[in-house]
Amino acid sequence: YVGPPGPKSIQIRIVRPNKSDFNPPHRDIYYDNLRNALNCFMPIFGVNEKSSLPILKGSHLWKENKTIRTHKYPIIDGNKFSVPAVTSKKDGSFLKLIRPKVKYGQVMLFSPYAIHGGGVNLGNEVRISFEFRFWKK
């Protein structure tokens, strides 16, 4: 079913060009109620290779002790966020997120263990997307 245990929700995310309307790279498992969800990203408007939701390929397989993350409510580049940010791997290497080409009418599904976010909209248009989750009943 769609929605968390409790109220069901579909979020409309609006990310303006070159603004801090995004979350930093993170995993949804940092919230207990999202651990067992399947994430869905559905583009509505302004989604392209410069504005799509970034995701780190294969990161859903990484052990948590292989990453460095902040506390909740980190301040990064002067912006306060509500989710702990994954800043790097423990070996000091940078995170190499990609922006999948998700076409209109398609949905990108991904694990709550996948590192995603950090997507400054580098395009010229506002990015609008639906974000929702499925839970096993």
Q: What is the predicted function of each stretch?
A:
Residues R27, I44, S111-P112, F132:
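Residues immediately flanking
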